[in-house]
């Protein structure tokens, strides 16, 4: 999330994004993690999960800013995937074919129409567990054991 959102409630952060009222929103290299996300992802990786990241950015220049943030905050190593300018969200996922997608509900930018999973082909959706979290709420509430993640599947 943008650095100036640190002390605010989830709803206020969503409002900041919708209204574009904070200059740090577009300062991608200064983004900060939500909650204990690095700890949770490291725990899952240590259990054998292969962690991949899907960037919202459309250019390699901005994806490199994501990489800076991931390294700075010691996120587990993983490939960062992103879509090209004219591509839909589903294309990077169709290449990766993950077992599980954890994504936020995109409340501040239009909801499920901006999400990845709802835009996947039905035959791919049937092979992937979708877990949706509230935007800016983090993943701390998800189980530590990767075998329990499927219990948190979200129907869209």
Language-model features: locations:
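Residue-level signal for short, function-critical loop segments
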Residues: 57
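Asp-based phosphoryl-transfer active-site loop
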Residues: 1-23
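Intrinsic disorder/low-complexity segments
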Residues: 6-8, 50, 154
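Short alpha-helix boundary/capping motifs
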Residues: 31-34, 60, 83
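A broad, low-specificity signal for short, low-complexity segments enriched in glycine/proline
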Residues: 12-15, 60-65
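Short, acidic loop-to-helix structural element flanking the phosphoryl-transfer center
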Residues: 22-51
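C-terminal cap/substrate-recognition subdomain and adjoining C-terminal extension
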Residues: 62-156
């Amino acid at each position: 999330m943008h650095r100036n959102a640190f002390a605010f409630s989830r709803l206020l952060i969503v409002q900041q994004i919708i209204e574009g009222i904070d200059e740090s929103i577009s300062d991608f290299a200064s983004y900060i993690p939500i909650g204990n996300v690095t700890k949770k992802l490291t725990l899952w990786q240590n259990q054998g999960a292969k962690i991949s990241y899907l960037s919202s950015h459309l250019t390699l220049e901005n994806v490199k800013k994501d990489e800076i943030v991931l390294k700075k905050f010691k996120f587990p190593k993983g490939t960062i995937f992103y879509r090209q300018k004219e591509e839909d969200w589903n294309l990077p996922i169709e290449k990766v074919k993950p077992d599980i997608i954890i994504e936020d509900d995109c409340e501040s930018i239009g909801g499920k129409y901006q999400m990845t999973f709802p835009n996947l082909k039905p035959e791919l959706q049937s092979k992937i567990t979708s877990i949706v979290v509230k935007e800016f709420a983090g993943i701390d509430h998800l189980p530590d054991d990767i075998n329990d993640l499927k219990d948190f599947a979200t129907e869209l």
